[in-house]
């Protein structure tokens, strides 16, 4: 988190802790989960035409300027779609971003929040985002 904050302090509007940029990686995930995550991020890049490699990342740091630029009332998504929409809004508003490599380790306790509803919302939601006033 410190590296994300340092990136924002240096003038970047959004710093993303990325599993998929150079130097980032995932530990202890089954191949099927990695494959789903990787192709979901590729899908988002293609539909929204953004350069973020890890659009579903949960580790991020926004500047006040970035958050102030986003129409938060327009983002009614949950789960991964919410994460994607926030990042997309920053880019759509012409602000800067960077991806900072992280090592993502699979949880040792608890269960994933992924559900078919969250997956469907993200899959269809990116098409809605293209038309939204963010």
Task: Show where each model-derived region lies.
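DNA-recognition element of transcription regulators
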Residues: 84
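C-terminal, non-catalytic tails of nucleotide-sugar-dependent glycosyltransferases
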Residues: 124-134
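Generic helix-packing signal
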Residues: 8, 21, 91-94, 126
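Residue-level marker of intrinsically disordered, low-complexity segments enriched
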Residues: 14-16, 98, 127
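Catalytic donor-sugar/metal-binding loop of nucleotide-sugar-dependent glycosyltransferases
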Residues: 50-51, 74-78, 87-105
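Acceptor/aglycone-binding surface of glycosyltransferases and processive sugar-polymer synthases
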Residues: 1-80, 107-122
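Unusually extended, aromatic-enriched hydrophobic runs near protein termini
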Residues: 94-118, 132-134
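Amphipathic alpha-helical interaction segments
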Residues: 70, 88-90, 96, 112, ...
């Amino acid at each position: 988190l410190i590296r994300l904050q340092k990136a924002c302090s240096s003038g970047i509007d959004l710093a993303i802790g990325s599993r998929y940029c150079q130097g980032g990686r995932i530990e202890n995930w089954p191949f099927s989960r990695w494959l789903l995550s990787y192709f979901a991020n590729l899908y988002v890049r293609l539909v929204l035409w953004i350069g973020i490699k890890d659009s579903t990342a949960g580790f991020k740091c926004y500047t006040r300027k970035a958050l102030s630029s986003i129409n938060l009332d327009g983002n009614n998504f949950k789960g991964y779609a919410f994460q994607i929409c926030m990042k997309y809004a920053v880019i759509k508003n012409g602000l800067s971003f960077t991806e900072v490599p992280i090592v993502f380790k699979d949880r040792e306790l608890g269960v994933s929040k992924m559900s078919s509803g969250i997956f469907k919302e993200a899959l269809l939601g990116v098409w809605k985002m293209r038309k939204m006033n963010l």
